[in-house]
Curated annotation (Swiss-Prot):
Pfam family, one: PGM_PMM_I
Species per Swiss-Prot/TrEMBL record: Yersinia pestis
Function description: Catalyzes the conversion of glucosamine-6-phosphate to glucosamine-1-phosphate.
Enzyme category, top tier: isomerase
Segments traversing the membrane: none
The EC number(s) this enzyme carries: 5.4.2.10
Name of the protein: Phosphoglucosamine mutase
Keywords: Isomerase, Magnesium, Metal-binding, Phosphoprotein
Intrachain disulfide bonds: none
Gene3D superfamilies xref list: Alpha-D-Glucose-1,6-Bisphosphate, subunit A, domain 3, Alpha-D-phosphohexomutase, C-terminal domain
Active site (catalytic residues): 102
InterPro entries on file: A-D-PHexomutase_a/b/a-I, A-D-PHexomutase_a/b/a-I/II/III, A-D-PHexomutase_a/b/a-II, A-D-PHexomutase_a/b/a-III, A-D-PHexomutase_C, A-D-PHexomutase_C_sf, A-D-PHexomutase_CS, Alpha-D-phosphohexomutase_SF
PROSITE patterns named in the record: PGM_PMM
């Protein structure tokens, strides 16, 4: 990927009120995007958002910029990211824009774009938008200004789409499900989908106030979900992140089930049904246990760079249909075009119902190796990964693992963090000690 000024691995993101997430920047971004996208013909753009309080301000700024460029906006209101991708396709809009910072705290926000086919914008289009940003803002003639309208049935359209990915001959009548919507964009979608398919649904994280998104709930913190599943005697729990493109699950015993395990279940079920096309794509962070379990099933597996866009690129390159990150981004190209937490969850529930198996039993064919991830915040002025001390400690740990594990150090694409991952076939306490040793060296270098 080329060196761009504003766009990162997942759009543009930052703290609200600080560059680049300011009203004036976002207005200019809307205008620049409008100028570039108008060249392709369509004059309408879908705009969705999660439940952050800043979403109101930013969608107004975006709409003003688009209107000045002559494009009209169609607002969905709070809506999961994959719903915006879906609506962009069905409305034949030139693009979709999501205002969200995904799993980040409420005081962050971001902007990401989808193309007309519901996939993320190609690099060259993002680069063209950045180039347009450098030009002075102009306004089309009054008669050519864009308009703004609301898609009044956006939620209902997406609910029906999600239900359509669940087999019509099955139902969820026998399941009690706890769903945690992270006080985010799925709060009015996921419970309805599950109830309409017959499940008994208990909700948590479904009361957004603009500031409680992802706060001690959702896919990034499943402790509350684990407690509630056990307290309610539920069969399963589902947790989404703030914008609904990630999924974590909890089995009836309170165990967390991550993106690697979800990918394993979906791949194995696809194989059983004769519907698996090729293999499965994971990432550099995928647990080695996933690779070994898929190998036992004869399912090919490759690792992409971390980031759902890279998973998708690898899937397209291979012609494969399923891929996931262990963080819970699950992409199922036979169902949709981007990571979709609700759709992924429905495929796991399908496997449970069809095979009369618990989530715990579905996971039993895959043994997760101990994997410790430590996030180290740094100033951003120096790259700790280039430190001689960090390299030396990393070499020592790799030698101790003796070929029975992996060490991975990488910079986050969205935050000033170094992610330290150590994985191996050893006691978890030993793996944690190794990871903390490297993390301490990174802290000292940062």
């Amino acid at each position: 990927m080329s060196n761009r000024k504003y766009f990162g691995t997942d759009g543009i993101r930052g703290k609200v009120g600080e560059s680049p997430i300011t009203p004036d920047f976002v207005l200019k971004l809307g205008w620049a995007a409008g100028k570039v996208l108008a060249r392709h013909g369509s004059r309408k753009i879908i705009i969705g958002k999660d439940t952050r309080i800043s979403g109101y301000m930013l969608e107004s700024a975006l709409e003003a910029g688009l209107a000045a460029a002559g494009l009209s906006a169609l607002f969905t209101g709070p809506m999961p990211t994959p719903a915006v991708a879906y609506l962009t396709r069905t409305f034949r809009a030139e693009a979709g824009i999501v205002i969200s910072a995904s799993h980040n705290p409420f005081y962050d926000n971001g902007i990401k774009f989808f193309s007309i086919d519901g996939t993320k914008l190609p690099d060259d289009v993002e680069e063209a938008i950045e180039a347009e940003m450098e030009k002075p803002l102009t306004c089309v003639e009054s008669a050519e200004l864009g308009k703004a309208n609301r898609i009044v049935d956006a939620a209902g359209r997406y609910i029906e789409f999600c239900k359509g990915t669940f087999p019509s001959e099955l139902s969820l009548n026998e399941l009690k499900i706890v769903v945690d919507c992270a006080n985010g964009a799925t709060y009015h979608i996921a419970p309805s989908v599950l109830r309409e398919l017959g499940a008994t649904v208990i909700t948590i994280g479904c009361e957004p106030d603009g500031m409680n998104i992802n706060e001690e709930c959702g896919a990034t913190d499943v402790r509350l979900l684990q407690e509630r599943v056990l307290a309610e005697g539920a069969h399963v729990g589902l947790a989404f992140d703030g914008d609904g493109d990630r999924l974590m699950m909890v089995d009836h015993l309170g165990n967390k089930v991550d993106g690697d395990q979800i990918l394993y279940i979906i791949a194995r079920e696809g194989l059983r049904q004769g519907q698996l096309k090729g293999g499965a794509v994971g990432t550099l962070m995928s647990n080695m246990g996933l690779q070994l379990a898929l190998k036992d099933l004869g399912i090919p597996f490759v690792r992409a760079k971390v980031g759902d866009r890279y998973v998708l690129e690898a899937m397209q390159e291979k012609g494969w249909r399923i891929g996931a990150e262990n963080s819970g981004h699950v992409i199922l190209l036979d169902k949709t075009t981007t990571g979709d937490g609700i759709v992924a969850g429905l495929q796991v529930l399908t496997a449970m119902v069809r095979n009369h198996m618990s989530l715990h039993d579905l996971c039993s064919g895959m043994k997760l190796l101990p994997q410790i991830l430590v996030n180290v915040r740094f100033s951003g002025e120096h790259n700790p990964l280039k430190s001689d001390e960090v390299e030396e400690v990393t070499r020592q740990v790799e030698k101790e693992l003796g070929g029975r594990g992996r060490v991975l150090l990488r910079k986050s694409g969205t935050e000033p963090l170094i992610r330290v991952m150590v994985e191996g076939d050893a006691e978890e306490s030993l793996i944690a000690e190794m990871a903390n040793r490297i993390a301490d060296a990174v802290k000292a270098a940062g």
